[in-house]
Amino acid sequence: MTTIVSVRRNGQVVIGGDGQVSLGNTVMKGNARKVHRLYNGKVLAGFAGGTADAFTLLERFEAKLQAHQGNLERAAVALAKDWRTDRALRRLEALLAVADEHKSFIITGNGDVVQPEQDLIAIGSGGNFAQSAAIALLENTELDAKTIVEKSLKIAGDICVFTNGNHTIEVLDYSAK
């Protein structure tokens, strides 16, 4: 799988992920891009799960963003509805972490839309490790969101064999607004 982490702090939301693609116990690729900017750079999205499945969901989510004029919550709910009712989509095994300047959501393979606690999302095989690290850093430091994401991904990569050190990190800075 992979590790995707999102942290919101002090006028920034950041999503980061590693680049490892595995097939069973074999690393197939180390530099996959699993974090993307959508809707003219106003929305961040990261995915964990089967790569082809995740790209399919990412494309569908981007279409929902367009259809709902960039309204993140409406797009997430619309995708989740499709996910639950479309037989082909129900077979896709992936998770999405999405965020804009106002809200963050996890969209699950069961068609659930979850708004996280503590302005923190961590999904994928290394998600629990990254979440633990991020919580500790959020509660005990004044580090910015990007640094917390970087450190959380590093810790997850040191523990999880399905997470590597090749990170893609995207930042939405809305502190000046």
UniProtKB/Swiss-Prot annotation:
Q: What keywords are annotated for this sequence in UniProt? A: Allosteric enzyme, Cytoplasm, Hydrolase, Metal-binding, Protease, Sodium, Threonine protease
Classification via Pfam families:
Proteasome
Q: Give the gene that encodes this protein.
A: hslV
Q: Which residues of this protein are catalytic?
A: 2
Q: What is its EC number?
A: 3.4.25.2
GO molecular function annotations of the record: metal ion binding; threonine-type endopeptidase activity
Q: Please tell me where Na(+) binds in this chain.
A: 157, 160, 163
- How might one describe the regulation of this protein's activity? Allosterically activated by HslU binding.
Q: Which reaction does it catalyse?
A: ATP-dependent cleavage of peptide bonds with broad specificity
Protein name, as recorded: ATP-dependent protease subunit HslV
Question: In the record, what lineage is assigned to the organism producing the protein?
Answer: Bacteria, Pseudomonadati, Pseudomonadota, Gammaproteobacteria, Aeromonadales
Which InterPro entries does this chain map to? ATP-dep_Prtase_HsIV_su (IPR022281), Ntn_hydrolases_N (IPR029055), Proteasome_sua/b (IPR001353), Proteasome_suB-type (IPR023333)
Which NCBIfam families would you find in this protein's record?
A: ATP_dep_HslV, PRK05456.1
Where's it found, cell-wise?
Cytoplasm
Which example biological process does GO assign this protein?
Answer: proteolysis involved in protein catabolic process
List cellular component terms (GO).
Answer: HslUV protease complex; proteasome core complex
Q: Which family does it belong to?
A: Belongs to the peptidase T1B family. HslV subfamily.
* Superkingdom: Bacteria
Instruction: Give each disulfide bond as a residue pair.
Output: none
EC class: hydrolase
Q: Organism source for this protein?
A: Aeromonas salmonicida (strain A449)
Assembly and interactions? A double ring-shaped homohexamer of HslV is capped on each side by a ring-shaped HslU homohexamer. The assembly of the HslU/HslV complex is dependent on binding of ATP.
Its biological purpose: Protease subunit of a proteasome-like degradation complex believed to be a general protein degrading machinery.
Q: What is its main location?
A: cytoplasm
